[in-house]
């Protein structure tokens, strides 16, 4: 596999629980709210699983836990298990990588985050992802 990590240098978009980035000087309590959602990871995990499974109906996905060993089109249950392992207290400082070869897009799920990051998505892919996240109460935005 080519070096997909070069995609981390490309433009990226965020799939998030919030419709836009919270300003650093916000009067709200972003970090407390984020911790609230992180304590309820199973619900957030289910949303990410449903989005990625639906996306997998349209595109092949290669999934990796270490960035070296990749598996093409995990069974739905295996994809759910992999995402759950990371979002529900998986390896500290670890990420789960989903590569969409046809789109040359890398999706990263960080174990301690309430979002997924899409690196180098095409406009067509962004349009599809925006449609898929709506039923889950998620949003897509560019930092």
Segments the model singles out, each with a brief description of its role:
Residues 1-115, 119-143:
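Structured alpha/beta or helical-core interaction and ligand-binding surfaces enriched in interleaved
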